[in-house]
Swiss-Prot record:
Descriptive protein name: Structure-specific endonuclease subunit SLX1 homolog
Domain of life: Eukaryota
Subcellular location, record wording: Nucleus
Gene name for this UniProt entry: slx-1
Compositional bias of kind Basic and acidic residues: 125-136
Organism name: Caenorhabditis briggsae
Amino acid sequence: METFILSSDSDDDCPPPPKRRSIEGVPKSFDGDKKMRFSFDVTRDIILEDSEAPCSSNNIFTPSFRRDSNKTLLKTPVSLRRRSRSMNCMTPIVDTINEPPINQVCSAFVQKEIQLDDDDDDEKESSTEHADDDLNLRALLSPEKKKRKEKVDKRRPFGVEEVQNEFYGVYCLISRSERQCYKNRCYIGYTVDPNRRIMQHNGGRFKGGAKKTDSRGPWDMVCVVHGFPNHVAALRFEWAWQNPAVSKSLKEKQLKKERKETPFAYQLRIACELMNSEAFSRFALTFRWLNTKEELPFPISCTPPNHVKLRYGKVKKEMSLVPAKSADYVAMGECRLCGKDIEKLWGLVRCISQSCHSHFHSKCLAEHGLKNKNEYADQIYPLKSNCPICGHFYLWGDVVREQRRIIKVSTKCAEEFRNKVVRKDLPHREISSRLRLKK
């Protein structure tokens, strides 16, 4: 069997180099290949010695080479025939896709709904013509998202607006886990709704609970300190309660847990120290026991301040009604101390007594309270004082809380009542939590 042996780097006249490997089945000349990668899809015809194979456009991958007349062309091995051809001159065959016009992509369905034909025949013809287009357009148009239905409180009267009174509290939890390493541990947190927050902690992280309380419960919310003027003050109290060794208010006292002191008794002592500190002692705070079974006496060395209220039971949401009648609003009027008109609603405060209807400038009432307590040179606002008109005792924190409720109602009321003050004798609605028991 005759073979044609030639190196791909050699010329026709020159013999191949002595130490260069020759490849069987590789043609000698690449003149007709147009500098493309050689393909082994060769023909089986016998080519004369002096003739050259024509290179046509239809057969650009068929190599042209010269061979001896006495030699026959060797059949290309199967392993070499499987190699790919050059991709330089190959054009991909792509099926044409009938895409809809741009102006019909987003408006085809809209136009079909708007244009109403009078004749039934025209409607049938248009439906058959656009039947194929509709199938293609359905993949291009995104489905419409269903709007979530707004939750309506069934306990609220229909058509009556309400605003929730502000609540900022810092609570303490106790673990009831059966595992000894987690039992009786305490956790300090901040919340605006204690009834909802305790369910989140017992539900785990997927229900909104904290990382440190996940799979370490069940937890009991024992007590909560509330009455802060805003969320910033409450968060500062929470951080100081969690980090007594680093807090500016307590780091000088170096509070440490005693040997026979329980974890909750230690946390209660820290809370009492914070309520007596300079940063929080002038707030109208309330200490509430949520679980009376865990009630402990306050430490003798640091009892809460006298103005701090002590309460028992669960926290209830208070909702203030937004009245729609003009009879439920009163004019701002003039200040009962300076006699000048009150121009802005945010500068108005009033006595918290139900029988007194006096309005004051916030600056005037604060100066009056500071002068009575001889604190005008040291403080900005009084801790507690008496109304100059009726003599009713008040805490400044309660006065500010009432002012914020008035402003909150004014943002929800009608435009004609924006510069008026809502009456204080309107009823408030309390919402008690409904805990879902597991079956």
